[in-house]
């Protein structure tokens, strides 16, 4: 137990230290903190000083100048005759940042987010080991290296709700896969309620988690599921009423100056869903905004999920469900994949599930293990490299990050497809890479995992757990995989 506590501490401080390396990096050449980030900080400042969401006085007094030297795009409109202005962003992140922003400004806010990212990494490691029975040593290495790589470390200090949402999601998974007690149900309600209040885009993954919880417990814990359903229903109604009352619409976008023709324009005026389907692979492979060029370890993402479904479907289905829902939102709902932000933003919320799946894969296959380690280390170096460039005014985190001089990124970008290019060469490159991933996936799921010769294996299965005992009288290897239903 003490050894595992040390591993948790190692992951915490590794995540925190790597995240802090970019704390002074510039988002753009005109601002340390830019785009949507100032909106969250101004709202946090208003909550700290005025105890309300109205940022009109903060905008008039240019309270953003310490972190945004240029004139700020206000993003909001007058909501009434008194000139009230409320940022078109959900309020839970500003509420979390209100205390650090009030006490220490933008720097304290970034530190608070970095600490929260470290906590998210710790919870992810705990879930991997305690809920999915991954080797503590391997899980520690995988979680540490991937939380220290983009995009996880990128959003550890950038002021967005992505990392708090990832914490809410992995906490929900920890609760759902454990015992269904009244305290656990209360905790799950809090975690799930937090997600939409961080951003309305997390409603689909919230619904997926809630439905899975009800499916898992409907027959065995009827009383708890009734209670859960009623409270979550009340929470949803309250969410809509409060948004209608404060923001003038069903979502925060009703107060935004970009959506004066309708709040649901946030997904696009005439979204071409067929064209957006290209993002299914683009989110992984795009030479600028994909996961793989920055952290090559994510080449293992699809093989990892395929392997977990094949080998441990019942246990890992929740991981895959969350990943599929989150990936679908990033593909078909998000306005764009190429935005004014660091790559992978829309995926951060579900990447803890991918990291756990990759840890399971690394435990079973040595080749994949070292690939994930080395690909993750490349991601760590990429971030440290760019953080130094962005801190010394040679590059920025959201304008020209793809012009970094980091050689491994540049080498991969040269051979990966550009999803802003609709020519045949980009399509061919996409097909080649997808074929490579498909081949790697097939080889992974068709290869039998090795069992040591000469050691008998006893396997005992019930509806809720699997117990494997393997070895001799002098040495036993016991593994227990549990899906609690009580």
Predicted segments with their positions:
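Perimembrane helix-loop-helix junctions
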Residues: 177-178, 204-237, 241, 302-312, ...
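Transmembrane-helix motifs of polytopic, lipid-linked glycan transferases
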Residues: 108-133, 167, 171
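Short acidic/glycine- and proline-prone juxtamembrane loop motifs at membrane-interface regions
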Residues: 154-164, 290, 343
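Membrane-interface alpha helices of multi-pass inner-membrane proteins
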Residues: 44, 142-147, 175, 184-199, ...
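Membrane-lumen/periplasm interface segments of specific transmembrane helices
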Residues: 224-304, 313, 319-330, 378-399
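Transmembrane-helix signature of polytopic, membrane-embedded enzymes
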Residues: 124-150, 166-167, 181-187
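Interfacial juxtamembrane loops and adjacent helix segments
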Residues: 49-101, 256-274
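Hydrophobic, aromatic-rich transmembrane alpha-helices
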Residues: 121-122, 214-217, 291-317, 354-361, ...
């Amino acid at each position: 137990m003490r050894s595992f506590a040390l591993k948790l501490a190692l992951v915490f401080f590794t995540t925190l230290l790597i995240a802090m390396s970019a704390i002074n990096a510039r988002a753009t050449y005109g601002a340390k903190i830019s785009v949507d980030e100032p909106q969250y900080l101004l709202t946090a400042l208003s909550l700290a000083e005025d105890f309300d969401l109205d940022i009109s006085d903060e905008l008039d007094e240019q309270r953003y100048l310490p972190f945004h030297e240029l004139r700020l795009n206000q993003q909001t409109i007058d909501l009434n005759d008194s000139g009230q202005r409320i940022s078109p962003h959900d309020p839970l992140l500003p509420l979390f940042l209100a205390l650090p922003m009030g006490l220490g400004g933008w720097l304290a806010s970034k530190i608070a987010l970095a600490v929260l990212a470290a906590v998210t990494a710790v919870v992810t490691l705990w879930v991997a080991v305690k809920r999915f029975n991954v080797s503590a040593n391997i899980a520690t290495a995988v979680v540490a290296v991937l939380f220290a790589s983009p995009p996880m470390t990128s959003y550890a200090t950038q002021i967005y709700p992505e990392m708090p949402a990832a914490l809410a999601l992995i906490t929900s998974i920890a609760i759902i896969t454990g015992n269904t007690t009244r305290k656990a149900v209360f905790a799950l309600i809090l975690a799930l309620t937090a997600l939409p209040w961080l951003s309305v885009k997390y409603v689909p993954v919230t619904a997926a988690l809630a439905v899975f919880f009800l499916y898992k417990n409907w027959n065995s814990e009827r009383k708890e599921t009734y209670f859960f359903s009623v409270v979550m229903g009340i929470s949803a109604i309250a969410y809509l009423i409060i948004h209608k009352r404060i923001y003038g619409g069903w979502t925060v976008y009703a107060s935004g100056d970009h959506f004066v023709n309708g709040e649901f324009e946030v997904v696009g005026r005439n979204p071409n869903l067929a064209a957006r389907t290209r993002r299914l692979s683009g989110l992984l492979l795009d030479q600028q905004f994909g996961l793989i060029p920055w952290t090559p370890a994510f080449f293992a993402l699809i093989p990892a999920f395929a392997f977990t479904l094949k080998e441990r479907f019942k246990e890992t289905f929740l991981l895959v469900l969350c990943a599929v829902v989150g990936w679908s939102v990033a593909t078909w709902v998000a306005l764009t994949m190429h935005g004014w932000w660091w790559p992978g933003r829309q995926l951060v919320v579900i990447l803890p599930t991918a990291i756990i799946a990759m840890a399971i894969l690394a435990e079973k296959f040595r080749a994949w293990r070292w690939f994930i380690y080395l690909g993750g280390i490349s991601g760590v170096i990429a971030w440290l490299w760019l953080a130094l460039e962005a801190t010394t005014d040679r590059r920025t985190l959201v304008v020209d990050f793809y012009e970094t001089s980091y050689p491994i990124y540049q080498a991969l970008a040269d051979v990966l497809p550009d999803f802003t290019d609709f020519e045949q060469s980009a399509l061919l490159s996409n097909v080649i890479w997808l074929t490579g991933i498909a081949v790697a996936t097939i080889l992974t799921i068709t290869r039998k995992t090795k069992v040591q010769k000469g050691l008998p294996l006893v396997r005992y299965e019930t509806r809720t757990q699997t117990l494997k005992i393997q070895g001799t009288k002098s040495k036993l290897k016991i593994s227990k995989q549990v899906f609690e239903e009580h």
